[in-house]
């Protein structure tokens, strides 16, 4: 599945990734208010006959993922949480991957320290939660290519 997801991620242009992040930063300020604009990353595939992709995330790390009380701006229901929805950069990327795979998407909220265990146990299929590969994590799970690249740095006086 890693190679397939990498192929899907490779179809997302840098400009679209940047536009999506800018959009999510803006939307995270008032997530329950419908901005009335299309999400920057969209799939044209509406076929969900290949099953369900179960994704884990914290739903608490804006602009990557957050919890809201409406389905505004492309948010998806959080499985097992009545009237709560997830949105953010990670959610929109997960929606795109699921659509391109021909699958429905289910989002599950986990504490950060429980994400890898959720994949290992089979409770979910994957994590989209801004998690970077480390040697320890790579012993436990497989990683796709990066779906977000940051140029954040520390600024120091010369």
Describe the residue ranges of each PLM region.
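Ligand-binding "clamshell"
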Residues: 1, 35-37, 123, 135-150
